[in-house]
């Protein structure tokens, strides 16, 4: 009602907020013609949400999904229509979430993944286009240090002459159009022998199931066993036919090379998420729970 009563033209919100609003509007056949610009950030934006906007917004309303962090915002941006027309189908097949091209003034690189401090920038750190690596950014608005946290500053900043690169703590890759594809948090990757599984590409496969609200990849047994935890859209289904539901999900995973090694499915009624955006999944809490299952 405030959007309609005050004829709001611009809005910023998390994917969870807009998922709730858009579901209500579609169900109640409500359109929001005053909106001209919407920014959605805080977590990857589901394709189902972007498609739903077609039913409630005017065609000229721009829906932007910028990518960034507290230390560096914005970094890249992409508009809804480009996602729906060009990248969404690839995201659903597990390529990651396309977050667009760097904004003016920001320089991005993809480097080989490391959990250690990098003492200085070297050209050999960068990896070829198309490979998943660690995302780093250089821009005038990026924070230089963490207050009284020299250890964190050393771990997240790469000196480069008189400037520096900031390590986003995320993994991703470039496509042929020089767009960035987000593949999850670096610390959430699951390493099994010579194979590394990344959260966003893996979860996208299981999220295609109509009875899945969202999913989370975690590692059990000291990160050696990959597990997909499902928050069901229909909680009754888990109670009634858990075995068939699990079989359907495992078949989905087996159909794609990057999820073929996932053999364990668990169900969790309501995922723990961050208070601010109500969208970031606390995978660490889910991983701790999975250890006891």
PLM regions: where:
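Conserved ATP-dependent adenylate/AMP-binding module captured primarily in the ANL superfamily
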Residues: 1-9
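Adenylate-forming AMP-binding core of the ANL superfamily, especially NRPS adenylation
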Residues: 44, 66, 79-80, 85-148, ...
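Conserved C-terminal "lid"/linker of ANL adenylate-forming enzymes
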Residues: 190, 216-218, 250-293
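Conserved C-terminal helical docking segment of ANL/AMP-forming enzymes
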Residues: 196, 209-214, 232-269
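Active-site glycine/GP-rich loop and adjacent strand/helix microenvironment
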Residues: 41, 50-51, 69, 75-78, ...
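Conserved ATP-binding/catalytic segment of the ANL
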Residues: 117, 125-192, 196-199, 208
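C-terminal boundary motif of the adenylate-forming
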Residues: 120-122, 169-171, 208-233, 261-263
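Gly/Ser/Thr-rich phosphate-binding loop
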Residues: 8-13, 22-94, 107
């Amino acid at each position: 009602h405030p959007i309609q009563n005050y004829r709001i033209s611009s809005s910023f919100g998390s994917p969870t907020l807009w998922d709730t609003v858009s579901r209500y509007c579609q169900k109640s056949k409500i359109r929001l013609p005053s909106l001209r610009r919407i920014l959605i950030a805080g977590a990857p934006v589901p394709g189902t949400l972007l498609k739903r906007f077609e039913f409630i917004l005017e065609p000229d309303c721009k829906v932007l999904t910028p990518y960034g962090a507290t230390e560096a915002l914005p970094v890249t941006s992409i508009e809804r229509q480009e996602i729906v027309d060009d990248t969404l189908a690839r995201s659903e097949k597990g390529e990651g979430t396309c977050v667009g091209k760097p904004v003016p003034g920001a320089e991005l690189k993809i480097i080989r993944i490391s959990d250690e401090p990098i003492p200085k920038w070297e050209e050999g750190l960068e990896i070829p286009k198309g490979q998943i690596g660690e995302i780093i950014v250089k821009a005038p608005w990026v924070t230089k240090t963490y207050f009284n946290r020299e250890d964190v500053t050393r771990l997240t900043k790469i000196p480069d002459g008189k400037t520096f690169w900031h390590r986003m703590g995320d993994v991703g890759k470039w496509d042929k159009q020089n767009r960035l594809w987000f593949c999850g948090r670096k610390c959430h990757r699951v390493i099994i022998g010579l194979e590394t599984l990344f959260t966003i590409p893996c979860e996208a496969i299981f999220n295609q199931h109509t009875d899945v609200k969202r999913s989370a990849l975690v590692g059990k047994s000291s990160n050696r066993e990959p597990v997909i935890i499902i928050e069901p859209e229909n909680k009754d289904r888990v109670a009634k036919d858990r075995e068939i539901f699990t079989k359907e999900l495992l078949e989905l995973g087996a159909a794609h090379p990057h999820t073929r090694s996932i053999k364990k499915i668990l169900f969790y009624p309501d995922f723990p998420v961050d208070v601010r955006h109500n969208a970031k999944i606390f995978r660490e809490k889910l991983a701790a729970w999975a250890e006891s299952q």
